[in-house]
Amino acid sequence: MMITRNFIGVLALCLCALAACTSSKESKKTLTVLSWNVWHGGHSKTYSGKGCEVTFDILKKSEADVVLMIETYGAAPMVADSLGYSYNLISDNLSIYSRYPIIRKYAFADSISTFNFGGVMIDVDGKPVRVFNTWLHYLPDMRLAPTDKSKEEILAWEMEGTRDEEIHKILSVLQPLLAEADSIPIIMGGDFNVHSHLDWTEATRNLYLHGGAVVDWPVSIAMEEAGFKDSFREMNPNPVANLGVTWLTDADSLETECRMDRIDFIYYQGKTIQAIASECYDNSLGKTFTFKGEDFFYPSDHGFVLSKFELD
């Protein structure tokens, strides 16, 4: 009788543990985020009449829960209507679309222009998540990076522009929210218009037209030092095997050989969020793009980043 009681007790404990484990798994939510510079709102004169519609089609095919759009330029209402999502038009340039309710909007116009930065808080089935969209200045042009120079000269060239100043302003205004990131996770993506130190390594110095250079690009260093993780590089840690090109997708239309690299990112931070998948889609402007088994005309000069996260 005692053996039977002990067995029943052990069985009950096992069932409770199994139920707790199952409940924990079921309580985790996934959130898929897409970041894309759609090139003049999808209505560039280069491909007049094609870009908008196919941009919407690709976004729908992605099944992203959140879309960070750069170079929105008039497309926001049509994108939101096409997806059936809530949206926040931060500026003519930046917009965010969400399958989940937007419960707060963020702008820091006194410190950083809304043309460069802004965000929202969304409610993912009771779990708040802060999401920010970013655009840093395109000059100095990454295509012209003097990779035949010393590391110091390359960094001096980069500092001639405003990207370093912009990212530090952004990180400064985010400080109070970063302090809460372990309870309310933060996702920050967009078009940073600059390379990453995680891509310009000793292993890649003689690849991808890097010209032998190993460069600690300041913007990605600043993001890392602020506690952000690069979702794509975390999921694809070998830049030799997968550089993750997002620019220039129209490189083969240029008269001279041009460096193609990763300048679009999705970063994240917080104890209750973890990247579980990420891909960069480096596609050629104006060419056929096969995505999830379907062919599309590709409308942008940027590829896009698609990252999937798990929320505790």
Please place each PLM-identified region on the residue numbering.
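Active-site environment of divalent metal-dependent phosphoester hydrolases
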Residues: 40-43, 73-78, 115, 139-142, ...
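Acidic/histidine-rich helix-loop elements
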Residues: 35-53, 137-162
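Structured beta-strand-rich core segments of catalytic domains in phosphoester-bond hydrolases
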Residues: 66-145
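Bacterial Sec-dependent N-terminal signal peptides
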Residues: 1-28
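His/acidic metal-ligating clusters that form di-metal
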Residues: 159-192
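N-terminal, active-site-proximal structural segment of metallo-dependent hydrolase catalytic domains
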Residues: 18-82, 128, 301, 310-312
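Active-site metal-binding loops of divalent metal-dependent hydrolases
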Residues: 36-38, 136, 191-192, 303
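Metal-dependent phosphoester-hydrolase catalytic domains
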Residues: 176-186, 194-312
